[in-house]
């Protein structure tokens, strides 16, 4: 084979590898592309009037308290009143984690009013578990925006010292340790959330070491691009032309509602402009629209599953994925046993050398085969 032909073939192979890496299942190209979104955003909008939100029936104001430091990661799980099995599955698996990588983690469940049920069961559950937040609105899919805003407003009022907030659903498995690691890697000072600091020491450290220092903005998730509203009235994703006129074009980029992370500073900015945004029943789109109004672009993270369900796999669930969608209560427990071991302690590596080398690509390929 002539040398020039060999070089051409080698160059073609290298080019294919680069294209595959950037635009294939790895998602690296999407992550790089999302970094350019901030430069395309309009100037931030002015704050709107205070939000009119439903009153809290179970406010649980002390849920974020305690003798230790405030949560580094606060997880808000949107759930329905009747989904007790899902909540208990989370409590018995990843929701039981209170500390990851030396930082405090807190998981709370967010819901509205049950239909045709008494409140006594939820009140008893809240008294026993201490992790329920309930507000006075009808719990339904079309009220997810109201539910999410209520949760974010609770965070801003009762837990403003939390650093990151993950909004997720009760059919999502969350890899808490790896998510905390991901957030640590994405930067920002974290000394005030160090393990073991007393509240008084922590407050002093914050004022001395970080006075005048802005909390880094972050809106992280599985980003959807150029999604147009669904006009079919029967669809639960239906958005009327009154809410989103056709001449407005597609929705701005937004992170999938199955799991996205907001820094506390991003939460506060979104709450300031939310009353001026069109009230869309699709909460993830609404958050994306509100974020755009404050000049905040979503950052794509391929490790967050979005709507993708991943089959149970020790390497994927334990190392490379941060979330997996459509996980029922039984599989939630199975995933936990797979990752943690029957005795609750991991005694061997999650991944073989080859699995580790292939990383997220392998997990996405498994999901594709399963679909």
From Swiss-Prot:
Keyword Glycoprotein: yes
Lumenal-side positions: 26-371
EC number: 2.4.1.62
Topology with respect to the bilayer: Single-pass type II membrane protein
Biased composition annotated in UniProt, kind: Basic and acidic residues: 194-207
Top class in the EC scheme: transferase
Function per UniProt: Involved in GM1/GD1B/GA1 ganglioside biosynthesis.
Protein name: Beta-1,3-galactosyltransferase 4
Native species: Rattus norvegicus
């Amino acid at each position: 084979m002539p040398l020039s032909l060999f070089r051409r073939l080698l160059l073609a192979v290298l080019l294919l590898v680069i294209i595959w890496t950037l635009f294939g299942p790895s998602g690296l190209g999407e992550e790089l592309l999302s970094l350019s979104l901030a430069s395309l955003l309009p100037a931030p909008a002015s704050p709107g009037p205070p939000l009119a939100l439903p009153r809290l029936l179970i406010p649980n104001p002390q849920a974020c308290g305690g003798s230790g430091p405030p949560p580094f990661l606060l997880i808000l799980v949107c759930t329905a009143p009747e989904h007790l099995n899902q909540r208990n599955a989370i409590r018995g698996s990843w929701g039981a984690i209170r500390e990851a990588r030396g930082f405090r983690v807190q998981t709370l469940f967010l819901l509205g009013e049950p239909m045709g049920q008494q409140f006594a069961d939820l009140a008893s559950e809240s008294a026993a578990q201490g992790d329920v937040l309930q507000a006075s609105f009808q719990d339904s899919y079309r009220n997810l925006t109201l539910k999410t805003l209520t949760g974010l407003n609770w965070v801003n009022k009762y837990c403003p010292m939390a650093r990151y907030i993950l909004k997720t659903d009760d059919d999502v498995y969350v890899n808490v340790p790896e998510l905390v690691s991901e957030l640590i890697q994405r930067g920002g000072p974290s000394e005030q959330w160090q393990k073991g600091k007393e509240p008084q020491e922590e407050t002093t450290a914050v004022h001395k070491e970080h006075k005048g220092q802005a909390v880094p903005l972050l809106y992280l998730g599985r980003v959807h691009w150029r999604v147009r509203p669904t006009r079919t009235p029967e669809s639960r994703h239906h958005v009327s032309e009154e809410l989103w006129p056709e001449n407005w074009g597609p929705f701005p980029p937004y992170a999938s509602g199955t799991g996205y992370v907001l820094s506390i500073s991003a939460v506060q900015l979104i709450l300031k402009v939310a009353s001026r945004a069109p009230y869309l029943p699709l909460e993830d789109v609404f958050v994306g629209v509100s974020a755009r109004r404050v000049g905040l672009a979503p950052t794509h993270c391929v490790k967050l599953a979005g709507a993708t369900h991943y089959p149970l796999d020790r390497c994927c669930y334990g190392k490379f994925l941060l979330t997996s969608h459509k996980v029922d209560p039984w599989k939630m427990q199975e995933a936990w046993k797979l990752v943690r071991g029957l005795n609750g302690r991991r005694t061997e590596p999650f991944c073989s050398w080859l699995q580790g080398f292939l990383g997220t690509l392998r997990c996405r390929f498994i999901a594709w085969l399963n679909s």
